[in-house]
């Protein structure tokens, strides 16, 4: 897939603005962001602040209203090379088997069947779906379905992995299992890639991120970027036992609760 | 739902014994579920048989008390049916109607699906012709029969056109709706993985629309049967429609019910056939595999 020299940022947004409905709705405005190659960036922010829209812009699924968005140094025009996405709603095709769903991205990008077989089987094994090749999505639990979504993206060997709240629809235990699996995967040198991971869970962001971007709403922009104090390799227990974990978590939570501008507090009568 | 297997990524080459055990559990679960489904199927069949006996029993006893030139009983109808099947009389009148049904329905399927897809894909075609379709679909087709007779005569050609007109609209409209109702999320998945337009249709849009198309076919079958009898009654009186008219006008009530019941059975049989096709081509719409 696309290879970019490691010093070109994977993604670069310069004064990027996206508006909907003839400008009536601002998803994000004048947003600046740089994601380095192989970096895991987690984005947290209130609902509706434009996180999904930002990810869709990077995936080339929607145009910017103004500003610039570069992937591997090139302006985004349609879905760029080397980018793969994992959806919150899984996005599996119900009429395709687990194997064919996993192979979908590769096949659509013209991979030959030998490559497809080798790569899809490898990732199905890796996420514990061996023996489910011929099952259909509706026969799987939510956690297993999202594993297929992960296989579909990973099998393409993307240099940028876009994850839009991939584990949000799962129960707490399954979510934790999948977080650990993803963490383990990202610690394999050959699997490491740039990843933009959107989440509402501060714990999840702290567990996975190299850096954490906090977005604010109306208009959506990056408010602050925190660098993770946890080094690599890491694991769930180690991260959660680290004294800085609670501290950072409290800080991010306070950031998400209190808008920077007090005038943006809504009067109490409006909130109910 | 099946349990999530507790295999983590650290252990890519899994423990074989555990894997085999898991496989065995899976087979066990599948067998148990299959047994439960079979039991339920038998129970349902039994309930239906009992119900059938009760209703036919009431008809038999009650029907026997009424004027036999206006009413008949199941036993008499069965006797008549055996006679009409053995003499070939039933088939003789059913065959030409079935042939018309076959012609008209086949053309309706091809034209209906193609037109539905074109309307859904090209907004120009939709804008230019969509309102004719709405208009014609709202017009009772029976009203067009005199015109068709003037244009195409009384025979097979006219009957085929009538059948086509009855069956065609639900297929077109459902195909169109099926395409329009494809989840935007799935389309976005296709686009995110860089599908070409052709691939998007083949892998996402058409399979997603398929259940709608099949529903359209089912509606069209029902309307097609109506069209078949209507064509028999309103053009050259022939086929199964003729059989009904002739037996009714001579007050042979037992014989008259034979083609009527045959039409009902035909409808049930064709829907069942369609359901089989649907399970074959769209297995993900099966609901009976869930507990
Ligand atoms: N296609 C669209 N048309 C119009 N408005 C849109 C569209 N997509 C998003 N929006 C609006 O843009 C804003 C940002 O939406 P977005 O989905 O990016 O938020 P989000 O941060 O992902 O929220 P959440 O955390 O709830 O997923 C919202 O106000 C939303 O209503
Ligand atoms: Mg979102």
Name these PLM-found stretches.
Chain A
Residues 44-46:
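The feature captures the beta-strand-to-loop junction immediately N-terminal to the Walker
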Residues 96-103:
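Short coil-to-helix segment of the ABC ATPase nucleotide-binding domain corresponding to the Q-loop/switch region
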Residues 136-140, 144:
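Conserved ABC ATPase signature
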Residues 107, 114-132, 184:
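Conserved ABC ATPase "signature" region
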Residues 155-159:
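A short, proline-enriched helix->beta-strand linker immediately N-terminal to the Walker B motif
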Residues 67-79:
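Conserved ABC transporter NBD signature motif
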